[in-house]
């Protein structure tokens, strides 16, 4: 409670010091963008400029009605520009805001379609599925019909530059260690928990996904490969409105889901409610073959292990989010958000294991029917504040957050050993109960201020505190009696505190824009293995560490011409071990495979450099290089016939690559988004006393074809292909997937039907091999990836008369606003 009180006090003090803010006259400029047929154009980039020197002030994008608004403008002369792929750039007349006329509405601005040199066809502008910005790539989830009935993990898997390994660990441009954020906030989940969460988060709840390979100092330094920010939907229209989405997905097993989004905004208040439910069923078939070798020069085979595990899971999940914004005036907003979800996963598996001699003759057979039932709950609360001093961009925001995760897993392992002629030789039953809780407290504040001579200052602080409690109670079952297994029963607590402060300075020199920043982070953590007091192995032990690091960033942008832009950026980042990865006790997957933590695991540090060129806002080419020290990844240690999987620091990772992203207007009705990257990765170090020196070059190709057909029909054909790659000890063979979808607007464009088929060739089957110590292993993994999904979406309600929600539309300069409405900024 003391920590909560301290954070709340800091939050209230921040608000109190702002109660005497001076009020200045605030003007407004708005307008509408239409095409040559008089139809509104969505997602057009609108830039507000000063008439005296053409200096850029703000940027936004048009709403679905083609509307845009710039609020809180001081008196002066302005004009706007409108730009969108497939249209000629448009300039408005000069508008003057002065005493007696603080609001100006432009007449409808008509954009003219341009003709490409490819086939001399016109291109229709619309919200693209993928947008390439100087500092990030944006995935517009609803723009792709193939996202129908999918999950956040499915969307990420086909995102440009994103790859998933055999355990669904996420890599960005060939590098692991990505920080995944939800609405600008870290999840604080382990890799396995994050994968489970993303598999349960429906794509229908997501608005955008931002991919940032080298974020500025404003963001957490965590994530050596960058940040993936998943922005959930937030209704922005005034009045009462909402939508209902119903989806049925069918693979081998059914996966129904539904969601409801409501929003009511009137006067000084905005209320919103999002709720959803999904019931996913699926399967996984995992085949593992291990050859145990003698430690002699010949590496002769000592024994052979072949395992086939069939898993069936059921995963019902319910989620809800409720929030309110109170607009004190045009400049100041207070808000709160509460949310939660409940997930109850039931996993049932059966493993058939053959233990053989070097001549492939069976020595024994093991059959293991296992169950693992996990109930996972989350609750969070946020208080947020935002104040815009003026239209020049001076702004202050503050957030106070509390997040709690709790879970309990009930495990049952039954191992039956048979002779080659199927005579039962032995049976062992192990049960486990593993409760866990995570509590997270954060406070942060951000301040932005334009300074004299064109400088812009950004600064802020963030304080976070995390505590976790984990217990593992294991029992050996003999007959009807359960006895405590003292070699496995354990308890572990972990505490972590990170204090951060950052500063960014931006300045434009003619065609050059320079941003230099630095983030200082102080980390303190403490882990305590409580033990069970019954064995020497699990006696009480603890560890702690404190360290402070500086993380500089630098961005140089050169606008060579209207169509050519060059960007060079540098950043230093950190990736801290997940608290579960520091937990030293074992977690059982089956009798021959364990997971364990490593209390000696150190953070890894990465230096990233990128050079990119963007042509005509459609073709972006990027060169990148990164160097990671203390690189940690999943390692495999052999203990008898059992394999122990744990994270370990293995040495140095170097990554060099080139990527190309191109939005190609093939025809008036056909736009292709092409992405490709080539990455060279090298690992050097020492692992379990053996030298490690592995390298690989991997090609990733991602193609997304969007078809804008007549009479409200749209279609998509997309896919990706990845050649062989390496991650530490693991080599993964080529992998790919194809997706097709079609969508139709109905009910006077208030509703839509979407049909999608994912992995229609059933090629998304991760497989590869692992060489470690005196063991060679291969693995093959297939799951319920081939699916057909049908979705119905109905949008209802309408804005109040004379009121527009465009001021809350998420645009280039509205990122902070969007994050505040989500309950906070990404920091």
What label would you give each PLM region?
Residues 51-67:
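Short, acidic Ser/Thr/Gly-rich low-complexity loop/linker segments typical of extracellular
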Residues 431-432, 440-444, 485-490, 596, ...:
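Outer membrane beta-barrel strand-and-loop segments of large Gram-negative receptors
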Residues 34, 39, 45-49, 83-85, ...:
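Short, acidic, small-residue-rich periplasmic hinge/interaction motif at the N-terminus
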Residues 108-110, 152-155, 194-196, 211, ...:
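N-terminal periplasmic accessory domains that precede
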Residues 153-190:
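Extracytoplasmic beta-strand/coil segments of soluble accessory domains associated
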Residues 221-228, 236-287, 315-318:
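Outer-membrane beta-barrel translocator/receptor signature
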Residues 400-403, 436-442, 448-469, 483-629, ...:
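Structural signature of Gram-negative outer-membrane beta-barrels, strongest in the C-terminal barrel
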Residues 97, 186-213:
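Short acidic/polar hinge/loop motifs at secondary-structure boundaries
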């Amino acid at each position: 409670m003391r920590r909560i009180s301290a954070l709340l006090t800091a939050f209230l003090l921040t608000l109190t010091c702002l109660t005497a803010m001076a009020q200045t006259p605030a003007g407004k400029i708005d307008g509408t963008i239409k095409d040559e047929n008089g139809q509104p154009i969505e997602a057009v980039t609108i830039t507000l400029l000063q008439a005296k020197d053409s200096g850029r002030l703000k940027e936004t994008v048009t709403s679905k009605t083609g509307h845009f608004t710039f609020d809180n403008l001081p008196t002066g002369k302005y004009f706007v520009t409108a730009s969108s792929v497939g249209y000629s750039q448009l300039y408005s007349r000069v508008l003057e805001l002065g005493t007696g006329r603080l609001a100006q509405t432009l007449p409808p601005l008509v954009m003219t379609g341009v003709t490409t040199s490819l086939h001399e066809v016109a291109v229709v502008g619309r919200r693209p599925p993928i947008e390439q910005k100087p500092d990030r790539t944006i995935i517009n989830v609803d723009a792709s019909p193939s996202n129908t009935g999918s999950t956040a993990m499915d969307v990420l898997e086909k995102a440009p530059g994103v790859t998933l390994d055999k355990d669904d660990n996420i890599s960005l441009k060939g590098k692991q260690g990505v920080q995944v954020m939800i609405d600008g906030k870290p999840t604080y989940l382990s890799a396995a928990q994050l994968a489970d969460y993303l598999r349960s988060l429906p794509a229908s709840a997501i608005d955008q996904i931002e991919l940032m390979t080298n974020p500025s100092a404003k963001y957490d330094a965590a994530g050596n490969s960058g940040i993936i920010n998943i922005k959930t939907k937030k209704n922005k229209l005034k009045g009462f409105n909402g939508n209902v989405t119903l989806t049925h997905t069918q693979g081998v097993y059914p996966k129904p889901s539904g969601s409801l989004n409501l929003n009511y905004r009137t006067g000084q208040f905005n209320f919103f409610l999002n709720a959803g439910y999904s019931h996913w069923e699926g399967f996984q078939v995992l085949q593992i073959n291990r050859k145990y070798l003698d430690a002699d020069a010949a590496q002769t085979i000592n024994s052979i292990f072949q395992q086939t595990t069939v898993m069936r899971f059921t995963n019902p999940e319910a989620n809800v989010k409720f929030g309110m914004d109170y607009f004190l005036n045009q400049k100041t907003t207070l808000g709160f958000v509460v949310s939660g979800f409940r997930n109850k996963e039931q996993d049932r598996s059966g493993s058939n294991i053959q233990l053989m001699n070097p001549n492939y003759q069976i020595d024994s057979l093991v059959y293991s029917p296992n169950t693992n039932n996990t109930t996972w709950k989350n609750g969070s609360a946020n208080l947020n504040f935002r104040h815009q001093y003026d239209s020049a961009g001076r702004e202050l925001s503050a957030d106070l957050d509390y997040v709690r995760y709790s879970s309990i897993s009930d495990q049952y392992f039954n191992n039956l050993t048979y002779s080659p002629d199927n005579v039962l030789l032995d049976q062992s039953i192990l049960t486990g109960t593993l409760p866990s809780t995570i509590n997270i407290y954060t406070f942060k504040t951000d301040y932005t201020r334009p300074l004299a001579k064109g400088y812009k200052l950004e600064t802020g602080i963030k304080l976070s505190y995390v505590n976790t409690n984990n217990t593992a109670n294991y029992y050996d079952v003999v007959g009807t009696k359960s006895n405590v297994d003292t070699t496995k029963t354990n308890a572990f607590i972990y505490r972590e505190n990170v204090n951060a402060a950052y500063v960014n300075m931006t300045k434009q020199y003619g065609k050059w824009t320079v941003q230099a920043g630095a983030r200082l982070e102080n980390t303190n953590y403490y882990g305590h293995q409580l033990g069970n007091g019954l064995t020497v192995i699990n006696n009480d032990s603890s560890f702690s560490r404190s360290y402070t690091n500086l993380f500089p960033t630098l961005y140089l942008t050169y606008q060579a011409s209207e169509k050519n832009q060059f960007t060079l950026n540098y950043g230093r980042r950190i990736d801290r071990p997940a608290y579960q990865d520091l937990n030293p006790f074992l977690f059982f997957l089956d009798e021959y495979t364990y997971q364990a933590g490593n209390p000696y695991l150190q953070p890894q540090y990465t230096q990233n450099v990128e050079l990119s060129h963007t042509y005509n806002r459609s073709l972006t080419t990027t060169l990148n290089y990164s160097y990671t020290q203390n690189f940690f990844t999943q390692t495999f240690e052999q203990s008898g016939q059992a394999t122990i999987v744990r994270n370990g620091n293995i040495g140095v990772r170097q990554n060099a690559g080139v990527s190309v992203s191109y939005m190609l207007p093939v025809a008036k009705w056909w736009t292709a988004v092409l992405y490709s990257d080539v990455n060279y990765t090298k690992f050097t170090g020492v692992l379990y006393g053996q030298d490690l020196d592995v390298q690989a070059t991997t090609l990733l190709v991602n193609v997304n074809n969007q078809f804008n057909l007549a009479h409200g029909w749209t279609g998509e054909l997309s896919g990706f292909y990845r050649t062989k790659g390496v991650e530490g000890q693991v080599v993964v063979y080529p992998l790919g997937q194809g997706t097709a979808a079609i969508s139709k607007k109905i009910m006077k464009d208030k509703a839509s039907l979407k049909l999608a088929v994912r992995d229609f060739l059933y090629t998304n089957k991760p497989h590869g091999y692992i060489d470690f110590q005196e063991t060679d292993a291969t693995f093959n993994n297939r799951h319920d990836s081939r699916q057909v999904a049908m979705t119905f979406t109905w949008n209802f309600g309408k804005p109040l008369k004379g009121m527009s929600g465009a001021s809350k539309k998420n645009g280039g300069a509205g990122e902070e606003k969007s994050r505040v409405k989500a309950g906070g900024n990404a920091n």
